[in-house]
């Protein structure tokens, strides 16, 4: 099956009361694990790629070809989107699209509102010509993800969200509502009232960044309010790092990378399977 945009995935998720996971890839093993877990659960999946991860893996083109090769060799038949996570500029989004990405996020949330609108609209116009879906952000998601650092959380304004959607034609909206990138310090406090208002006023699938560490009860509460995409990265990184440490701590003679990266891959796979079940994505592939 060829790579697809995430637009139809998210519309179906919103209409049918589940969420599609975006699982960020950092190397070959992450990609194998996420694809295999999704295929075994018959779940559509979004492979997230930050600009930092893209640099680490040599570039957008390399990533697209790696994913396409794995889909062929692993006989992946579920819908798969490759999504640029936190694209920093129109130029970066264009570069990803031209390399074969099927979805992009333009994150101009740090800019003044009118500038955010203008940049986002420019990305949408280019992306939609190529059949590529676009996600945008309003407010500030706290924490750090690669080069994206935010000291605090600034909640999205529901009226600005509606205006951004109307003026740009985006396919999905990531309003900052209390989630953070990386591990949480204490219990997360999501703005469900704002989430419901934004979901109703925009009619768009909403995106929840910083999905690691959000309690299942909050995930289940967010989905009926329009959350159709949930991003996960830290949880997979923690699981894979623990698996590597366990192998190396148990046997100081190990040097073959397959001996420790294999268990890391399995740890990611099991983590993703758990998230797929939690988000209600199992058997939703079409």
Curated annotation (Swiss-Prot):
Q: Which UniProt keywords apply?
A: Glycolysis, Lyase, Metal-binding, Zinc
Q: Which Pfam families match?
A: F_bP_aldolase
Q: How is the cofactor bound?
A: Binds 2 Zn(2+) ions per subunit. One is catalytic and the other provides a structural contribution.
Task: Decide whether keyword tRNA-binding is in the record.
Answer: no
User: What EC designation does it have?
Assistant: 4.1.2.13
Residues reported in the UniProt entry to bind dihydroxyacetone phosphate: 182, 210-212, 231-234
The GO terms this record gives for MF are: fructose-bisphosphate aldolase activity; zinc ion binding
What pathway does the UniProt record associate with this protein? Carbohydrate degradation; glycolysis; D-glyceraldehyde 3-phosphate and glycerone phosphate from D-glucose: step 4/4
Q: Which positions does UniProt annotate for Zn(2+) 2 binding? A: 107, 137
Residues of the active site are 85 (proton donor)
Q: Note whether Zinc occurs among the keywords.
A: yes
For this protein, what reaction is catalysed? beta-D-fructose 1,6-bisphosphate = D-glyceraldehyde 3-phosphate + dihydroxyacetone phosphate
- Binding of D-glyceraldehyde 3-phosphate, residues: 50
Q: What does this protein do?
A: Catalyzes the aldol condensation of dihydroxyacetone phosphate (DHAP or glycerone-phosphate) with glyceraldehyde 3-phosphate (G3P) to form fructose 1,6-bisphosphate (FBP) in gluconeogenesis and the reverse reaction in glycolysis.
| Similarity comment: family membership | Belongs to the class II fructose-bisphosphate aldolase family.
Q: What's the name of the protein?
A: Fructose-bisphosphate aldolase
Could you read off the lineage of the organism from its UniProt record?
Answer: Bacteria, Bacillati, Bacillota, Bacilli, Bacillales
């Amino acid at each position: 099956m060829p790579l697809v945009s995430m637009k139809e995935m998210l519309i179906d998720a919103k209409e049918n009361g589940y969420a599609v996971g975006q699982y960020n890839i950092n190397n070959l093993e992450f990609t194998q694990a996420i694809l295999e877990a999704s295929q075994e659960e018959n779940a559509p999946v979004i492979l997230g790629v930050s600009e930092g991860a893209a640099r680490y893996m040599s570039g957008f083109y390399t990533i697209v070809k790696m994913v396409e090769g794995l889909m062929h060799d692993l006989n992946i038949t579920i819908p798969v989107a490759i999504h640029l996570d936190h694209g920093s500029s129109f130029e970066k989004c264009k570069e990803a699209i031209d390399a074969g990405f099927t979805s992009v996020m333009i994150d101009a949330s740090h800019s003044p509102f009118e500038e955010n609108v203008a940049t986002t609209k420019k990305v949408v116009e280019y992306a939609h010509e190529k059949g590529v879906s676009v996600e945008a952000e309003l407010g500030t998601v706290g924490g750090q993800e690669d080069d994206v650092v935010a000291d605090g959380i600034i909640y999205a304004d529901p009226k600005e969200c509606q205006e951004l959607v109307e003026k740009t034609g985006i396919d999905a909206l990531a309003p900052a509502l209390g989630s953070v990138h990386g591990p949480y310090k204490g219990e997360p406090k999501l703005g469900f009232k704002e989430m419901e208002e934004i979901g109703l006023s925009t009619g768009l699938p909403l995106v929840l960044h910083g999905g690691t560490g959000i309690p299942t009860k909050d995930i289940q509460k967010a989905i009926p309010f329009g959350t159709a995409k949930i991003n996960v990265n830290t949880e997979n990184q923690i699981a894979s790092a623990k698996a590597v440490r366990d192998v190396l701590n148990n046997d100081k003679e190990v040097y073959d990378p397959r001996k420790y990266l294999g268990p890391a891959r399995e740890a990611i796979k099991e983590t993703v399977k758990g998230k797929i079940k939690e988000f209600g994505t199992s058997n939703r592939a079409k």
